[in-house]
Amino acid sequence: MQDPIEASVAEAPEPSFFARPGVHAQVLPIGPGIPFGLERVFSSELGMGGVYGSWGRSYDNDELLEFIEQRLGESMKGDGVMNLAELGFQRRHHLPNLTEAEHLELELEVGACLLREAARVNGWKATEVQGVLIGMSGPVADDYVVQIARRAGIPHEALKVSVHKACDSSMGALHLALNPNLSSAGRVNIAEALRGKKVLVGGIEGLSRFTSRARDKNALQLFGNGAGVIGVIPGQTMRFLVGKSHEAFDKEGLLEVRMYYPYSGSKDGGSLVEVSQAAPDHVRVAGLMHEPEDGSPLVMAGLIGMVKLFVRTGVQVVTDVMREYQNLMRQLGTPDKSIAVGIVHHANLKINQLKAKQLNKAGIRFPMPWLLSEFGNVSAASNMIAFLRQLPKIRS
């Protein structure tokens, strides 16, 4: 039997995302002109949908090496070059040199467009949206979510939540929107506040900007821009069944990430995740990162280090949640109801294949399609993009 991930890998090189049928592409008049494309997805069966896309020039793997050489001012020949196709990536979206003001305007326009279009796909007016939860590894501004919501025409009183927990940020945002058990004493219960309301949840990752000052060759080859936003009505179009929250600090510095967001370091209740009320309508959820000592944006260990960081914990959490799910299905009298598909973070293909192998040893097996070949690792955006690409195939 084929591995559930290997069976889904595209054998032929992927064309540019902008050339994909159904993608609405334009050039934003910022700097020299920035390509920007979105694809709209809606499931009439499930009554929900969203938009996903990217911005910046689409580089294939050969072109990417030339781009990195120009950015670093040195050759990429030798041991530092990855076999990116084997890692599941054919393309990445990157930006030319822009000023800080241009980066801000670009990501504000991209974010506002994503929110407007995600609302429209779901048949909502922007003025009807009552919650916006966005995950970002390194926001271009502390109040980015507030700014894009305002620019998109979403009411001022709508609850805005910024989530900064690296690649987990968008799924952390979705978890907050659905699971009322995540609330702590004295703080707003986000899931209860948003139950039955029209909510936009997503991940927006300007990783070309984020890595523009990095010197780490692994990071420069893997990461790129990407975003995805879905519309949900918590408790109706999507509801929480079972789940698990797990925190693990990267003590060894296998993936060092600079925190470009407020974090006091108070470790309330011993948690690595800090929740603060940035404004009456704005909640910030910020995770503690192992920051690079040299002040650079990002420093990565090699592929073996990434496997060590992601696989062991990921497999354990999935195993625990699967046990809870199976127990729930037995209680509901549907013990044979299996998981139809798993939407997984696309850090790289080899990591996901190893996760699937380890889960299979534990008797856990379900499809985990590889869906982001023309994006690269887009951190918090990857699950949202993967979900939207899989959405037309999901049945109720």
Question: What residue spans do the PLM features occupy?
Answer:
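Conserved beta-strand elements of the Class I
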Residues: 47, 130-133, 198-200, 340
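A general structural motif
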Residues: 126-129, 156-158, 196, 336-339, ...
